[in-house]
């Protein structure tokens, strides 16, 4: 093999290495003696400068997407837990929840409340006119 063919072989291998780096298939081939040859940085033998690959440029977007996903997941879990606690507390005090619902304006007991108020006022008038019976002097107090 003469010297000219070895140069062609070296050029062919350099191009192949560059293509593999751009496609992301060369996992360990990029580690060289220079510290600037990390992930996403490929030496370009034809231009003499480093070219960044598309794989390294999109890494921060992927990390950001995962962080947003987990933030939404945590927020949803917190919201679901808060709602479930409110439901449990509402079940513990059914009388208060029922009273708030029934005594709302225009509720079911509005007509009943008006009728009861009328009968209470009538009963007070009768008691006031007749007077209360006097308690016996010797009655025991409870």
Curated annotation (Swiss-Prot):
Its main location: membrane. Potassium channel ancillary subunit that is essential for generation of some native K(+) currents by virtue of formation of heteromeric ion channel complex with voltage-gated potassium (Kv) channel pore-forming alpha subunits. Functions as an inhibitory beta-subunit of the repolarizing cardiac potassium ion channel KCNQ1. It is found in: Membrane. Keywords: Alport syndrome, Deafness, Elliptocytosis, Glycoprotein, Hereditary hemolytic anemia, Intellectual disability, Membrane, Transmembrane, Transmembrane helix. Belongs to the potassium channel KCNE family. This is Potassium voltage-gated channel subfamily E regulatory beta subunit 5. Residues 82-142 are cytoplasmic. Residues 119-142 are annotated as: Disordered. GO terms for biological process: atrial cardiac muscle cell action potential; cardiac muscle contraction; membrane repolarization during action potential; membrane repolarization during ventricular cardiac muscle cell action potential; negative regulation of potassium ion export across plasma membrane; negative regulation of potassium ion transmembrane transport; positive regulation of potassium ion transmembrane transport; potassium ion export across plasma membrane. One of its GO terms (cellular component) is voltage-gated potassium channel complex. It is a single-pass type I membrane protein. The chain crosses the membrane at residues 61-81. Highly expressed in heart, skeletal muscle, brain, spinal cord and placenta. PANTHER family: POTASSIUM VOLTAGE-GATED CHANNEL SUBFAMILY E MEMBER 1, 3, POTASSIUM VOLTAGE-GATED CHANNEL SUBFAMILY E REGULATORY BETA SUBUNIT 5. Glycans are attached at residues 2, 25. It is linked to AMME complex: An X-linked contiguous gene deletion syndrome characterized by glomerulonephritis, sensorineural hearing loss, intellectual disability, midface hypoplasia and elliptocytosis.
